[in-house]
Design a protein with these regions (language model features):
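Short, charged, intrinsically disordered terminal tails
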Residues: 1-8, 123-139
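Short hinge/gating elements
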Residues: 7-16
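Soluble periplasmic/extracytoplasmic beta-strand elements of cell-envelope proteins
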Residues: 17, 26-28, 67-69, 76-82, ...
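Short, non-transmembrane amphipathic alpha-helical segments
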Residues: 27, 89-108, 112
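Short acidic amphipathic segments
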Residues: 31-40, 110
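Short edge beta-strands and adjacent turn/loop segments
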Residues: 44-80, 124
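A short interface-forming secondary-structure element
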Residues: 72-94
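Intrinsically disordered, low-complexity glycine/proline-rich and charged
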Residues: 105-125
């Protein structure tokens, strides 16, 4: 019976463990790099992220909308995303998977077994513009 050779995270000199949070951050940043991704997370996660950004000293969490399971040699990823209107969702998903797998495997040495995407919303042009031309309804 053959035994698997140790991966880059385990050697005769010791073992390296990588926290879920580290993989979560790598995944979040790699997903955001893909053209066609507007944001990560569902509605509630994005709302909390927007509130968090307004608090002095806080920063946007790169792990928002990202869930990972990390084992000794493998990782599985679940992502919730918002895509840009007009982009092919299938092409964006393919690019996200490719970028996430490349980033995680390249930076950690973990084998990514799956990258599951849930597209929760589509960002429409003009969604970010506040309509200040309309007068307030209540004075």
């Amino acid at each position: 019976m053959e035994t698997a050779s140790p991966g880059p995270l385990q050697s005769d000199l010791g073992k390296t463990t990588i926290a879920d949070r580290v993989v979560q951050k790598i995944v979040g940043l790699a997903a955001r790099e893909v053209p066609g991704i507007y944001d990560l997370g569902g509605g509630a996660a994005r709302t909390l992220g927007a509130i968090r950004e307004r608090i002095p000293g806080s920063s946007q969490t790169s792990g928002q909308g990202v869930s990972v399971e990390v084992g000794e040699t493998q990782a599985a990823v679940d992502l919730e995303v918002v895509t840009e209107y007009g982009m092919s969702i299938a092409d964006v998903a393919k690019s996200v998977r490719r970028n996430v797998i490349s980033a995680v495997e390249g930076m950690t040495g973990l084998q990514v077994t799956e990258v599951n995407l849930s597209v929760n919303d589509i960002h429409l042009p003009g969604d970010d513009q506040e309509d200040s031309a309309q007068p307030a309804r209540v004075q």
